[in-house]
């Protein structure tokens, strides 16, 4: 097997390091975007839950106990 020139090894190392850094940067950007979208979705879900609770209150519907699914007025 032929020996690899030290200059060639440095070039290969540099290319691999650059490629790995680019991949890491892209994954970080994607991760940040995903986390941002999850945060947005969480805020929207919170708003939706609040709006549903407000609509239920306006309609005179009692909120259900989340553990037993029994209207809170019937709980003893």
From Swiss-Prot:
Keywords: Nucleus. GO terms for cellular component: axon cytoplasm; nucleus. Its main location: nucleus. It is found in: Nucleus. GO terms for biological process: axonal transport of mitochondrion; endodermal cell differentiation; muscle contraction. Coiled coil: none annotated. One of its GO terms (molecular function) is transcription corepressor activity. InterPro entries: HS1-bd (IPR009643). It holds the Pfam family HSBP1. It comes from the Eukaryota. Homohexamer. Associates with heptad repeats of HSF1 trimers and probably also HSF1 monomers, and with HSP70. Association with HSF1 trimers and HSP70 coincides with attenuation of heat shock response and the conversion of HSF1 trimer to monomer. Negative regulator of the heat shock response. Negatively affects HSF1 DNA-binding activity. May have a role in the suppression of the activation of the stress response during the aging process. Belongs to the HSBP1 family. This is Heat shock factor-binding protein 1.
